[in-house]
Design a protein with these regions (language model features):
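Periplasmic OmpA-like peptidoglycan-binding domain that tethers envelope proteins to the cell wall
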Residues: 450-507
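Ligand-binding clefts/hinges and TM-proximal coupling segments of bilobed small-molecule sensing domains
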Residues: 36-39, 167-194, 273-311, 358
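Secondary-structure end/capping motifs
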Residues: 263-353
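Hydrophobic membrane-insertion alpha-helices, especially the h-region
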Residues: 8-23
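Short, glycine-/small- and polar/acidic-enriched structural segments
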Residues: 28-202, 218-224, 247
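Pocket-lining segment of extracytoplasmic ligand-binding domains
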Residues: 117-119, 193-301
């Protein structure tokens, strides 16, 4: 009996101990936590009751970087325009980390951002999602980016077709885009990913140039003001720069699709504020870029500023209407830009597949620009600046003095046996060539017909010339200006190919 009493007493002691422990370890802290939470809520309510309503209707976190083309985002006029629309924009410089930038749009960390079109495509492929859409075009590179090299080692783009040639550049930058455009469009079968030597920043590319020799087979792919510095060396030349082609190095404003659905008005207000600032600075971009560079701690001299501003085409309101298809004009449509850039990225191995699955239209949203145009939004009188595809005509002597740029990569043109008639399959190839030539409007084209060494050489040369002229006629009939094309027969090498060499008239 006594032992049972001891057991029962022990059990009750355990139960009391458990209750005491629970009271001390759970109930008391929970009560204290509840009291603290109530006090915190009361404090927060007091803050709300003793504050004022914000002047801003919406806040937008906008991811971008220090590129001079983005100087308008950092301007006082843009801030004032946003304030008038009750928008607060927090600019976040992520050091051009495009993957994290797109992930930020995906997660809601950012609502809007600046991208180059190629970076948007590559980042979308990398994360396997399309969380952002293009709503406006910021600018297009027009000479700001260039590929330079020593004249002795690399006289033209054809000389790049050498496994010993190395490209010194920054990955995921306009410099890489420029290099991939050249890889895709010219006959550079010996150039591969191994040809690229990525470095951390522009200063490192320039340092590599300073340490190189004229015999080094290096290509330095950079932007202003470094290009100007390198070209001060008479032994260095500009192999190609972004003023020679169109629609590949293009900066755009993108919006998170979720945010766009949630608050399209805020995106519209942002775009109107930005385009108004583009108009405001239309005649003073040099001053803005100079002050922006000085503020960033990287002051530029007058010549560097002039070349930098000349190399960037900031798109105004009417040009955005044209690019986005809101108005019908001769400017390249953004859908074609996206398709062309995607093709370059796939053909050069930068991405394995098209993240838009052959539907470039899902990467842009033109409704906002359409709406503001229909509401007669024009910040001022602006001109739609166009580029003529018609080059000055040349005489025979001038044609003979063209400086070669490089030979375009074109699949073999096939003719009906013994004739100059282009086959239907090769007509498809020539149609693609027409589109390619439209993106290189600043160069003349020499169509070179080669001939077999068998049989009657003179007859073979005559056929080679007729085949070159047949191709020339096809291009002219499909919109290529007659002033920029010349068909010739070259001294026979045994091949029966037709080659396409771009060139320019030296000044």
């Amino acid at each position: 009996m006594k032992s049972k009493l001891i057991v029962v007493s022990f059990i009750w002691l355990v139960i009391l101990f458990v209750f005491a422990a629970a009271w001390k370890l759970w109930w008391v802290p929970s009560q204290e936590e509840a009291v603290e939470q109530a006090a915190q809520e009361a404090h927060e309510e007091a803050i709300r009751q003793t504050g004022s309503a914000s002047k801003y209707r919406t806040q937008i976190n906008f991811a971008y970087d220090s590129f001079s083309g983005y100087s308008i985002f950092r301007s006082e006029n843009f801030k004032n325009n946003l304030s008038q629309k009750s928008l607060k924009v927090n600019l976040v410089d992520d050091g051009a980390n495009y993957i994290e930038r797109l992930k930020g749009l995906q997660s809601g960390k950012y609502q809007m951002a600046a991208f180059t079109i190629d970076a948007l495509i590559k980042a979308s492929d990398e994360i396997g999602d399309l969380p952002a859409t293009i709503v406006e075009i910021i600018d297009e590179s027009r000479g700001c980016d260039a590929m330079t090299g020593y004249k002795l080692a690399i006289p033209d783009l054809d000389a790049l077709n050498d496994p010993e040639v190395k490209f010194i550049l920054i990955e995921n930058s306009p410099a890489e885009t420029l290099s991939r455009v050249v890889m895709s469009h010219f006959g550079l079968n010996n150039v591969s990913e191994k040809s690229f030597i990525p470095v951390a920043n522009a200063e490192e590319v320039y340092r590599r140039y300073r340490e190189s020799k004229p015999s080094d087979k290096f290509v330095f792919v950079l932007w202003e003001p470094y290009v100007t510095k390198m070209l001060e060396n008479p032994n260095v030349h500009d192999l190609v720069n972004s003023s020679r082609f169109r629609g590949y190095i293009v900066d755009v404003i993108v919006a998170s699709r979720d945010f766009l659905v949630k608050d399209e008005q805020a995106v519209r207000d942002f775009i109107e504020a930005y385009l108004s600032s583009v108009y405001h600075y239309r005649n003073t971009m040099e001053s803005l870029v100079a002050s922006d560079a000085k503020e960033a701690g990287t002051p530029l001299n007058d010549e560097q500023i002039k070349r930098l501003v000349k190399g960037i085409w900031w798109k105004n309101t009417v040009e955005n209407y044209a690019h986005m298809g809101v108005e019908s004009h001769s400017l390249q449509h953004i859908e074609d830009m996206i398709a062309n850039i995607t093709k370059v990225l796939i053909s050069t191995g930068s991405i394995s597949s098209d993240p838009a699955n052959g539907q470039p239209n899902i990467l842009y949203y033109n409704k906002i620009l359409s709406d503001i145009k229909n509401n007669n939004f024009f910040p001022g009188k602006e001109n739609l600046r166009t580029e003529s595809d018609v080059l000055p005509s040349l005489n025979d002597e001038e044609w003979s003095k063209l400086t070669p740029v490089g030979t375009l990569k074109v699949p073999k043109i096939v003719f009906a046996r013994g004739t100059s008639k282009v086959t239907s399959q090769s007509e498809i190839t020539l149609n693609e060539l027409v589109e390619k030539l439209k993106t290189w409007p600043q160069y003349y084209l020499v169509i070179k017909g080669d001939a077999s060494l068998r049989g009657d050489i003179e007859a073979n040369k005559a056929l080679a010339l007729e085949r070159a002229k047949s191709v020339e006629r096809y291009l002219l009939n499909h919109g290529i200006s007659s002033t920029r094309v010349k068909a010739v027969a070259v001294e026979p090498t045994g091949s029966t190919d037709v080659m396409f060499q771009l060139g320019y008239l030296p000044y």
